[in-house]
């Protein structure tokens, strides 16, 4: 089997080399002024492999050297990749010429096995129809109210008790794991009307959680393969990681389909008064069925389960390194929490929102996102794009560009989000272009759950910090790992201590 796999890969490479060698050298070398060293036939694969363990830092270093903040990374056997941190380019890709930069088949191939025809993995009519439905539902007061009640219940009756027990017993907890479990509970309740009860740490890991983790990780690693033929061949032969991925996806699809069938049955025999407010019930009521509705809810679970937990994990760690910032958050949230933190109170938490934005600027939940050019084009900075090129905007690198954020771009400074230093008067967040800070995408594909995500994060940060001190066990700087959603390598091991001030009310 191993010999056959090697032979097939070698045959594919020979084909690619022949194709490349027959192409015009002039065409290959357009736009190669900035980027890693590139050689005939093999492109930049030598530099890529050398820096594969530090791709984020490597791309950022290369982009800093480019006057246009755009680089070209040609790789053997793959499409040309254009990477940019230029906001003008980002706006052009995500808005101005949106229809020329769809996700494209190469992207949908990566995630198609898992996400199927869900909103985050399709283009054209399928995307627009799902987008219209999702935008309507996320804009309704009833869904926001339902989501807030789910959030409040999960925080007060599960998250806080888990942290209280850790504080009383003195055990070490992985805060990243706790927040991921919490987020999975919330997103499943809101999306499916189903409670996986992941924060019960005495129970085995839910099979759906385990399968989601495995499927997401292997799918993400497909994108980092320098030669796509490797994972595609493994998929055809059903061996190695691709076999493991197929099994995990089967588990996800089977379990979610069972939940969908049960929900549909309960709605059919129930009365109007018993109708649920979760997204699945709403999608079924709109006439969606079968694999279509399954793929839709899987996409929303995938989008919501790790993004907020990743952002909160990094913020909680950053606050342990910045006592003055933590103190300002407490000054903001303590008066609100003392009266019972409500939905309207979240609008008053401007400084907390600035801290969350600053954490996501430095450690974006999604490090990069790629589109594929439908036709030849020219970006605003003059970069020529060929049909089929992969065009990537790079939030991780954008957050570290001095040209965008100043000489302190690598420092954690929430005050940069205000027009002036927050003082005794209510601080006002200044408008920041979503094309400079595209962590929630921008343009027609801007995240429909953006405001709901901020609602969740602000409520959790306020509820946790007002009650507990978080003390990292390890003083080493955490390692940022980019997958489908970035996470902290090894988790965030902490001790939990109750706060000594008057709000210690649990």
UniProtKB/Swiss-Prot annotation:
Transmembrane regions: 2-22
E.C. code: 1.14.14.48
Disruption-associated phenotype: No visible phenotype under normal growth conditions, but mutant plants accumulate high amounts of JA-Ile and have strongly reduced levels of 12-hydroxy-JA-Ile in response to wounding.
InterPro entries: Cyt_P450, Cyt_P450_E_grp-I, Cyt_P450_sf
Induction behaviour: Induced by wounding.
Note: Plants over-expressing CAP94B3 are deficient in jasmonate perception.
Annotated protein name in UniProt: Cytochrome P450 94B3
Originating organism: Arabidopsis thaliana (Mouse-ear cress)
UniProt lineage: Eukaryota, Viridiplantae, Streptophyta, Embryophyta, Tracheophyta
């Amino acid at each position: 089997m191993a010999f056959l796999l090697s032979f097939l890969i070698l045959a594919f490479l020979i084909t690619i080399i022949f194709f490349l060698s027959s192409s015009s050298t002039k065409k290959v070398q357009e736009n190669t002024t900035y980027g890693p060293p590139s050689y005939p036939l093999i492109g930049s694969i030598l530099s890529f492999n050398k820096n594969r363990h530090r791709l984020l830092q490597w791309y950022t270093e290369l982009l800093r050297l480019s006057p246009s903040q755009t680089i070209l990374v040609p790789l053997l056997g793959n499409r040309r990749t254009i990477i940019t941190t230029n906001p003008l380019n980002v706006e052009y890709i995500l808005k101005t010429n949106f229809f020329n930069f769809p996700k494209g088949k190469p992207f949908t191939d990566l995630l198609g096995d898992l996400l199927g025809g869900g909103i985050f993995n399709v283009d054209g009519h399928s995307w627009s129809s799902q987008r219209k439905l999702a935008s309507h539902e996320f804009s309704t007061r009833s869904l926001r109210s339902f989501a807030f009640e789910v959030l409040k219940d999960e925080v007060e009756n599960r998250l806080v008790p888990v942290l209280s027990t850790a504080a009383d017993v003195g055990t070490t907890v992985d805060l990243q794991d706790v927040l991921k479990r919490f987020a999975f509970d919330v997103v499943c309740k809101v999306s499916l009307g189903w409670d996986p009860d992941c924060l019960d740490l005495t129970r085995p890991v839910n099979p759906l959680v385990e399968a989601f983790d495995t499927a997401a990780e292997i799918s993400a690693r497909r994108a980092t393969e320098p030669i796509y033929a490797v994972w595609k061949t493994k998929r055809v032969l059903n061996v190695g990681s691709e076999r493991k991925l197929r099994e995990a996806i089967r588990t996800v699809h089977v379990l979610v389909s069972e939940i969908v069938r049960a929900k549909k049955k309960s709605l059919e025999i129930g009365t109007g008064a018993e109708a649920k407010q979760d997204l699945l019930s709403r999608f079924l009521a709109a006439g969606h069925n079968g694999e279509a509705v399954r793929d839709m809810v899987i996409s929303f679970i995938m989008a919501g389960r790790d993004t907020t937990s990743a952002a909160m994990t990094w913020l909680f760690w950053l606050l342990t390194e910045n006592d003055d910032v933590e103190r300002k958050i407490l000054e903001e949230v303590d008066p609100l929490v003392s009266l019972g933190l409500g939905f309207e109170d979240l609008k008053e938490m401007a400084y907390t929102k600035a801290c969350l934005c600053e954490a996501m600027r430095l450690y974006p939940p999604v490090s990069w996102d790629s589109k594929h050019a439908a036709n030849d084009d020219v970006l605003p900075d003059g970069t020529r794009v060929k049909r089929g090129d992969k065009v990537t905007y790079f939030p991780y690198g954008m957050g570290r560009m001095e040209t965008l954020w100043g000489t302190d771009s690598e420092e954690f400074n929430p005050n940069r989000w205000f027009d002036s230093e927050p003082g005794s008067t209510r601080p006002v967040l200044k408008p920041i272009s979503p094309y400079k800070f595209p962590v929630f995408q921008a343009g027609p594909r801007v995240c429909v759950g953006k405001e709901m995500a901020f609602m969740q994060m602000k409520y959790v940060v306020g509820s946790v910090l007002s009650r507990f001190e978080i003390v990292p066990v390890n003083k080493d700087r955490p390692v940022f790992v980019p997958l489908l959603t970035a996470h902290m390598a090894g988790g965030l091991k902490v001790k939990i201590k109750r706060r000594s001030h008057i709000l210690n009310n649990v």
